[in-house]
């Protein structure tokens, strides 16, 4: 069968096993070694058929672990749709996940990538996650600190890569005195247009959704996996040198010696926004997004990605790293 993926790549699985419980997961791991673990299919590019057994993690359920007057600790099973979960928490009046609205994928993969948007990352809101060791079948609880979070990085992409399958994630959210992140220009502008000087988490989420919908394609209608490249982090010295030639190059300060530069701006300035080769290309509104216009193969999209990398490196001397996982 075709492996579900938001790039809409026609890649097939020899063995496909939908997993709806931890018991089913353990049983599948006893029978199938070296599995291919599938979540929401939203952060990967398939360049070939998958010969390994595909375990599709579909565990469902949302529950409150504990709460007090200020906070609530809420657990979501790995197969819960991320955006739907975010909207559920907002409907309950909880704050913390609003900036992460309309990110495609499932709950279980969010700690792996340490997903982030508009100044908020999973590391800022995750309390812990539960995972099963693929080799020993033992269950383990990882605290936030034990996940070794970095920019689009975690222990699950580093030291423990391929060793664990996340089954549930617990988030610490606010019930009052919400700390809202509205520092991005587009957010401030839209809040002002809507007359929202003190927005609720739900109102901020609606603004974020509006911004994302205005520039990001819906994978249901145009195959993509959101941001394909990481925003590169460069030295301030390098940035100041680039600023001489490109005075309008934007940046976000990381620390005293480093800044983050938007990859989308670099790709756009390199003249690649809207670039297309066959059915693979760079989106015409958001250069950070690669798209499948119809029947592109994973290899064709990867070729476009490599072309983008080479062009940006030649023009700016900056190497763009992939945010997506390539298989």
Where are these regions (language model features)?
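Anion-binding (especially nucleotide phosphate/pyrophosphate-binding) glycine-rich loop
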Residues: 1-135
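Generic structural marker for isolated residues within well-ordered, non-membrane alpha-helices
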Residues: 86, 263, 309
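Transmembrane alpha-helices
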Residues: 304, 310-311, 320-322
């Amino acid at each position: 069968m075709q492996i579900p993926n938001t790039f809409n790549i026609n890649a097939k699985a020899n063995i496909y096993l939908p997993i709806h419980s931890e018991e089913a997961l353990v049983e599948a791991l006893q029978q199938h070694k070296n599995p291919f673990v599938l979540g929401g299919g939203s952060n990967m590019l398939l360049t070939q058929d998958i010969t390994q057994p595909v375990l599709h993690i579909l565990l469902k359920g949302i529950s409150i672990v504990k709460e007090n007057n200020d906070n609530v600790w809420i657990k979501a099973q790995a197969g819960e749709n991320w955006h739907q979960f975010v909207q559920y928490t907002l409907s309950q009046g909880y704050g913390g996940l609003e900036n992460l609205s309309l990110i495609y994928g499932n709950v279980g993969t969010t700690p792996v990538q340490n997903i982030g948007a508009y100044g908020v990352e999973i590391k800022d809101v995750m309390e812990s996650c539960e995972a099963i060791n693929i080799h020993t079948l033992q269950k383990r609880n990882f605290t936030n600190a034990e996940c070794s979070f970095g920019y689009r990085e975690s222990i699950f992409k580093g030291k423990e890569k391929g060793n664990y399958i996340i089954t549930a994630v617990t988030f610490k959210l606010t019930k009052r005195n919400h700390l809202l992140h509205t520092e991005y220009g587009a957010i401030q502008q839209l809040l002002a247009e809507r007359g929202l000087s003190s927005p609720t988490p739900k109102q901020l989420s609606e603004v974020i959704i509006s911004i994302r919908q205005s520039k990001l394609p819906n994978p249901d209608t145009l195959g993509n996996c959101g941001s394909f490249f990481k925003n590169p982090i460069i030295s301030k010295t390098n940035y100041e040198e680039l600023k001489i030639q490109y005075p309008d190059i934007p940046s976000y300060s990381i620390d005293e010696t480093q800044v983050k530069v938007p990859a989308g701006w670099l790709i756009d300035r390199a003249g690649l926004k809207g670039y297309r080769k066959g059915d693979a290309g760079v989106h015409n509104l958001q250069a950070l997004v690669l798209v499948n216009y119809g029947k592109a193969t994973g290899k064709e999209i990867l070729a476009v990605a490599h072309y983008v990398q080479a062009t940006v490196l030649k023009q700016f001397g900056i190497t763009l790293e992939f945010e997506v996982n390539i298989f």
